[in-house]
From Swiss-Prot:
Pfam families: CitG. Its EC number is 2.4.2.52. GO terms for molecular function: ATP binding; triphosphoribosyl-dephospho-CoA synthase activity. The lineage of its organism: Bacteria, Pseudomonadati, Pseudomonadota, Gammaproteobacteria, Enterobacterales. Catalyzes the formation of 2-(5''-triphosphoribosyl)-3'-dephosphocoenzyme-A, the precursor of the prosthetic group of the holo-acyl carrier protein (gamma chain) of citrate lyase, from ATP and dephospho-CoA. This is 2-(5''-triphosphoribosyl)-3'-dephosphocoenzyme-A synthase.
């Protein structure tokens, strides 16, 4: 595995520190996929609304991606003197190479494409902050990632042409900005909602898995998930958001007995062919940021 020629400067970061953050990224991906039961998503119980992927695909994918996370951190450090808006172009070749390894590991199944984008951004932000001797906190990491993505939504979603991508169609039809919009805004759903919610539940002594499942419900209730909208349209997205909000209003996931509600929600998502993959990606970031 060779790193694309995207930078020439060297980094002063310790390899052990780089590997530590890369390991957290890998653990975040595994924590999310192993979390069960998750409505419509692949987990230890079933494949959710997916017929083309299984738990083992995600395990292989996460391992393949882990090998590339240090490259994102290194590029973030090496490009620390560049204008932040110029960093994204340098990250793209690394992301594409990482994506290639993911597809090879899964025999062509798209398991973690969204996480390559989001974790890649956060890892590059961490590298930049470390190189500049600035604090590495959830807020500084997300604001730095946002600076890399300035103007991204305008450039990539507001294009008018006859061959629209799925993301462009959802933006034009429903106003959903998806992963690009969340990144450009500095991951407000994570920073302002999911992360404080998760940490509060942990402080209250709730089991970590139950806390994560409840946090997933919060994300599903608030996120304009393009994965859901692409499968079920606006109606499918609004239904999923309402169902998640209803469960939260009933008390959320606080005891093992509450998992029955999630199992029923899972069955309904499978029947409707809905999978909140965008919210799953944000849950990965939530767990990752909770560790730093």
């Amino acid at each position: 595995m060779s790193m694309p020629a995207t930078s020439t400067k060297t980094t002063k970061l310790a390899t052990s520190l780089i590997d530590e953050y890369a390991l957290l990224g890998w653990r975040a991906m595994l924590t999310e996929v192993n979390l069960s039961p998750k409505p419509g998503l692949v987990d230890r119980i079933n494949c959710g609304a997916h017929k083309d992927m299984a738990l083992e695909d995600f395990h292989r994918s996460a391992l393949a991606i882990q090998g590339w996370l240090p490259r994102f951190i290194e590029f973030g450090a090496c490009s620390a003197e560049m204008a932040p808006e110029a960093v994204l172009n340098g990250l793209r070749p690394i992301g594409m190479a990482c994506e290639g390894d993911m597809f090879r590991a899964t025999a062509g199944v798209n398991t973690h494409k969204g996480s390559i984008f989001s974790l890649g951004l956060l890892c590059a932000a961490i590298g930049r902050l470390l190189q500049l001797n600035q604090p590495v906190t959830p807020t500084t990491v997300c604001s730095t990632a946002a600076s890399f993505c300035r103007g991204l939504t305008d450039r990539e979603l507001r294009t008018n042409n006859s061959r629209l991508t799925a993301g462009q169609r959802l933006y034009q039809q429903l106003g959903l900005t998806g992963a690009r919009g969340e990144a450009e805004a500095g991951y407000p759903l994570v920073i302002n909602h999911a992360l404080p919610h998760y940490l509060t539940l942990l402080d209250q002594g709730l089991d970590p898995e139950l806390a994560l499942l409840d946090t997933l419900l919060l994300l599903m209730a608030t996120n304009g998930d393009t994965n859901v909208a692409s499968r079920g349209g606006e109606g499918g997205l609004r239904w999923l958001q309402r169902e998640a909000q209803t469960l939260l209003q009933k008390g959320g996931i606080r005891t093992p007995a509450d998992l029955d509600y999630l199992r029923q929600f899972d069955r309904e998502c499978i029947e409707r062919n809905l999978s909140p993959g965008g919210s799953a990606d944000l849950l990965i970031l939530t767990w990752f940021l909770a560790q730093i």
